[in-house]
Swiss-Prot record:
<dbReference type="Pfam" id="PF03283">
    <property type="entry name" value="PAE"/>
</dbReference>
<feature type="active site" description="Charge relay system">
    <location>
        <position position="267"/>
    </location>
</feature>
<dbReference type="InterPro" id="IPR004963">
    <property type="entry name" value="PAE/NOTUM"/>
</dbReference>
<dbReference type="GO" id="GO:0071555">
    <property type="term" value="P:cell wall organization"/>
</dbReference>
<keyword id="KW-0961">Cell wall biogenesis/degradation</keyword>
<feature type="active site" description="Charge relay system">
    <location>
        <position position="334"/>
    </location>
</feature>
<comment type="function">
    <text>Hydrolyzes acetyl esters in homogalacturonan regions of pectin. In type I primary cell wall, galacturonic acid residues of pectin can be acetylated at the O-2 and O-3 positions. Decreasing the degree of acetylation of pectin gels in vitro alters their physical properties.</text>
</comment>
<dbReference type="GO" id="GO:0005576">
    <property type="term" value="C:extracellular region"/>
</dbReference>
<feature type="active site" description="Charge relay system">
    <location>
        <position position="171"/>
    </location>
</feature>
<keyword id="KW-0732">Signal</keyword>
<protein>
    <recommendedName>
        <fullName>Pectin acetylesterase 11</fullName>
        <ecNumber>3.1.1.-</ecNumber>
    </recommendedName>
</protein>
<feature type="signal peptide">
    <location>
        <begin position="1"/>
        <end position="23"/>
    </location>
</feature>
<dbReference type="GO" id="GO:0005886">
    <property type="term" value="C:plasma membrane"/>
</dbReference>
<keyword id="KW-0378">Hydrolase</keyword>
<keyword id="KW-0134">Cell wall</keyword>
<dbReference type="GO" id="GO:0016787">
    <property type="term" value="F:hydrolase activity"/>
</dbReference>
<comment type="similarity">
    <text>Belongs to the pectinacetylesterase family.</text>
</comment>
Length: 391
């Protein structure tokens, strides 16, 4: 659970960064409980909704919160006693910034849209759907129902009239945005322009330091525990094992809806948990290095550089379609679009001399295409922000 705590702490750090943003109150979707659409502990789903105005009144951005996964009864029991498993424990207000920001100066293309942050409390990237409730621990695996209930509620609140719409997310929420992307588009009016944006959600089917793939076995447990198979894209599960369809690189092959991927080539979460997970690092040789790449040996840095090659290979399906977008920087970071500082700020990362806010906006409105890969080595981009060892 150490990595999960680290991920939560990074999200809390991000929340601190956006304290100055507009605080948007929480909405509890109590009507969803009767449909069985509930958090791990049985509490109601929740989201934060900042209504659109002016030219953005019929435009919508639905942003899925991140926060890791739980893989079995034990980790899900731990999770349900946190805000990632119970809406009863969530903060009542959330500061909107970055891609959700309400200021034209920092979010010029989307500032006046209807902006929604969907809280994450199921531990399955909104894919779980098991009818039976764990009798001993009172656990509910209903992430897919939460997703459907929230979308239905937003449709009733005006999203059925959407002219433009984006499904986005950070980390596990960004994975959810990819997995539900085509379904999101099919729910909205056929006349609407609908696209998806993944920020740090392109988790690759990568090899770890032993040559195996710890993340594959990890995701297989998530899919099995939550009964996620039937909620994953049929275009993928019809030809591959369901647990492999938790990986974006296989879903992207058949995705019909345009997707923009924001990712760090040296993603801090993936370096820690896909490349060098604690469970396979028996000698703890990577314990210090994976938290602070400046403390890696030359051999370890070569391995980290090799991970970038794996990332590029996994992104092939995204790069093969001109309708898709890609902002792949060479930073050691995770979830970069959630604060104004990194989304559009003067000191935020650039790729091809472009901030991510402009890259995504130009791509969405088709002012220009944007598929750019940063310089190849770690620390080669001077615009990369410093990354805390807790990120």
């Amino acid at each position: 659970m150490t990595w999960l705590k680290q991920m939560w702490s990074s999200i809390l750090v991000l929340a601190v960064v956006v304290i100055g943003a507009r605080a948007v109150p929480i909405t509890y979707l109590e009507s969803a409980v009767a449909k069985g659409a509930v958090c791990l502990d049985g509490s109601a789903p929740a989201y934060h909704f900042d209504k659109g105005s002016g030219s953005g009144v019929n435009n919508w951005i639905v942003h899925m919160e991140g926060g890791g996964w739980c893989t079995d009864i034990a980790t899900c029991v731990q999770r349900k006693s946190t805000m990632k498993g119970s809406s009863k424990l969530m903060n009542k207000d959330f500061g909107f910034s970055g891609i959700l920001g309400g200021k034209q100066s920092t979010n010029p293309d989307f500032y006046n849209w209807n902006r929604i942050k969907v809280r994450y409390c199921d531990g399955s990237s909104f894919t779980g759907d098991i009818e039976a409730v764990d009798p001993t621990h009172k656990l509910f695996f209903r992430g897919a129902r939460v997703w459907r209930a929230v979308i239905d509620d937003l449709m009733a609140k005006g999203m059925s009239n959407a002219q433009n719409a984006i499904l986005s997310g950070c980390s596990a929420g960004a994975l959810a945005a990819i997995l539900h992307c085509d379904q999101f588009k099919s729910t909205l009016p056929k006349t609407a322009k609908v696209k998806c944006v993944s920020d740090a959600g392109y988790f690759i089917h990568g090899k770890d330091i032993t040559g195996g793939s710890y993340i594959q076995s990890y995701y297989a447990k998530v899919v099995a525990t939550h009964g996620s198979a039937k909620s994953l894209p049929a275009s993928c599960t019809s030809s591959m094992k369901p647990d492999l369809c938790f990986f974006p690189q296989y879903v992207a092959k058949t995705l019909q809806t345009p997707l923009f991927v924001i990712n760090a080539a040296f993603d801090s979460w993936q370096i820690k948990n896909v490349l060098a997970p604690t469970s396979v690092d028996k000698s703890k040789a990577w314990k210090t290095c994976k938290l602070d790449l400046k403390k890696c040996t030359a051999a370890q840095l070569q391995t980290v550089q090799g991970y970038r090659d794996q990332v590029l290979a996994a992104l092939a399906p995204v790069r093969s379609a001109t309708t898709n977008g890609l902002f792949l920087d060479s930073c050691h970071a995770h979830c970069q679009g959630g604060s104004a500082a990194t989304w559009s700020g003067d000191k935020g990362p650039t790729v091809a001399n472009t901030k991510m806010a402009k890259a995504v906006g130009d791509w969405f409105f088709e002012r220009s295409t944007f598929q750019n890969v940063d310089c190849s080595s770690l620390n080669c981009n001077p615009t990369c922000p410093a990354v805390s060892t807790e990120d």
